[in-house]
Each structure stands twice: as C-alpha cells, then as structure tokens.
From Swiss-Prot:
This is Retinal-binding protein. Outer and inner segments of photoreceptor cells. PROSITE patterns: CRAL_TRIO (PS50191), GOLD (PS50866). The lineage of its organism: Eukaryota, Metazoa, Spiralia, Lophotrochozoa, Mollusca. The keyword Metal-binding does not apply. SMART domains: SEC14 (SM00516). Shuttles 11-cis- and all-trans-retinals between rhodopsin and retinochrome and regenerates the photoproducts of both pigments. Also binds weakly to retinol. Residues 206-316 form the GOLD domain. The modification N-acetylserine is found at residue 2.
Amino acid sequence: MSLREQMGADTLIAEYTPPDVIQKFMTGGDVGHDKDGSVLRIEPWGYLDMKGIMYSCKKSDLEKSKLLQCEKHLKDLEAQSEKVGKPCTGLTVVFDMENVGSKHMWKPGLDMYLYLVQVLEDNYPEMMKRLFVINAPTLFPVLYKLVKPLLSEDMKNKIFVLGGDYKDTLLEYIDAEELPAYLGGTKSEGDEKCSELICHGGEVPKEFYLENTDDFETMETITVGSGDKIYVEYEIENENTYIKWEYKTEEHDIGFGLFRKNGDEWEEVVPIERTDCSIMTLDGSHKCKDPGTYALCFDNSFSMMTSKNVRYTAEVMDPEVDSEDINKMIKDSTWDELSAQIS
C-alpha cells in the first residue's frame, strides 16, 4: 500500500489541517503558473529551520502536509487546464538557497527534507517538472555531495543550477506577472516577496517544541538491551479494531514493527523498520482485521553495544462505525438507546 493510500490523501483537502508550526514556518508557497500552465512554487530553503520543525511535530504531519500540498497542486492543475483549454501538468520549483549556512548541513534535517521530496516522487511520479536552484552558496558543492546519493536519477535530470543571471533565465520559463518581484518579475502579493503567498520561514520558537508539552510525561518508558527485542502485547477482541502508537528514543535509533501471535510464533504484520527517532516522535496505526494477540516490537538486535531507552504510548480503538450504521442508529433508536449502542 502506498503512503498516499495509507494517509487517505483523497480526503486530506477536506479533512486535514497541518499543525501551526508547519503552517507558520515550513517554507514555500505557490504563486501562480509558468508559461506552460504548470504550478509555480517558490521554496526559500535558506530560511527553513528544519530542526525546529522536526522538534515540533510528528513525522506523519510532515508526510500528510506534503501529500496535502500535492493534492492541492492536482486540483490547481485541473482548474488551470480548464481555464486555458489545454492539459496543464507538473510543478516548476524555484529553490532559493539565499541564507543557506552550516545549520542546513544538519544530517537529520537534510534526510527528512529529501525524504519528503521522495514522498512526492513515489506518490506523484510525474509531478516534478523542473527545479531551478538559485543563489547557490559557496558550500553548495559540499551539500550536493551529501544529497547526491539520496536523489533518484530522474530527479537529478530535473535540477538546473542557475548563475547570477538567474532572473533572465527564469523569465524565459515564467511570465513576469507570475514571478515575484524579488526574483525578477512584477508580482507583488503583500510585498515584493509575495509574503501573502510564500512562507519565508524563520527560527521556530521553542514553545512549539513537543518536549514542552505534557505528552512525553504520559508515555511509558522501557529500556531495550543491546542485542535484544521487547514485545509489548495487546489483546484485540474484535475484528477491524485499530491500534495506534507513538514512540521516541532518548538517543540513537531503534527498530519498530507490529506482530500478531500465531501459535507459539510471532507473525510480522507491519515490517520492522530501523529509524533514528531521537529527533522527532514517530507514529502510526494499523487496522487489525482479525482478533488475537498483537504486539509492538522494539528491536535493538542490531546493536551489540548500546541499550536504548524508548518512550511510547499505544491506544486500542474500537472498530469504526460507518455512516450507514450511524444513520440506522439515529433512525431506529431513541437517544438513550443510541448512547447505549456507542458507549
């Protein structure tokens, strides 16, 4: 199952609102269209505080926000195609590296940003049309060496690094009235940087950090010894019950998966994935189609020298009641009967 299906991308526009920290500090914005009608997006990456954002939200929120962005692009392209009377496809990105410094070489942040690019590639393979890099800093060769192994060949072929005359080049592909004034066009929404359309990021205040909430205080804590695994069991009594989880290590990485007991053996349901989750909380859920004994597995078998302290929480949720069942309850039940049915 693709991430797009897992996250219910078809309903994100109607049902999902990103956390405040993503809305206020995740750089970028759509400003119009290029000459072919493709969506034009500006990414002022140099002003992105990826560490602050990763400290302030869950990985699933970053994934959902990227999918939401792509779903909005599809809607935009559909409307633009109808407006101009021809098919409009793809995304043109101006990737502005002004203000990029050593903080942007923080490996977890780079990995996460590139992972989100990979989310776009994997789930919307034809979305990215071209990416113009402008204001490349002196450390660009170092950054490129770091990210090159993580980019697909297809993505590499869509990247164009422009020199000091980038404004002239951009205007070959983008009409002036569609390009923000600070990039050589004439568009001004709020100011020459089109701040009403583009989030220009900035340092994330520490009050946004999840560590400042009480969530971590309510989590269970376990220590997974070096070379060891720990199974945390839950009894699932009904079909189609959901189990949800969140976890985070104090340091280092940990393997995590979901298993179901089959006789005396544990059967893998969600494959174990080894991830460094010391930076941000990882979360997920699974619909248990069959009753039985399920277990969250925290796997440290790959580490023969280091124990891992893990904080986690899990919740077992009753099977979904679909809208047809709800309508039947309301139609055929009194208020007291309805309360009894859903309690």
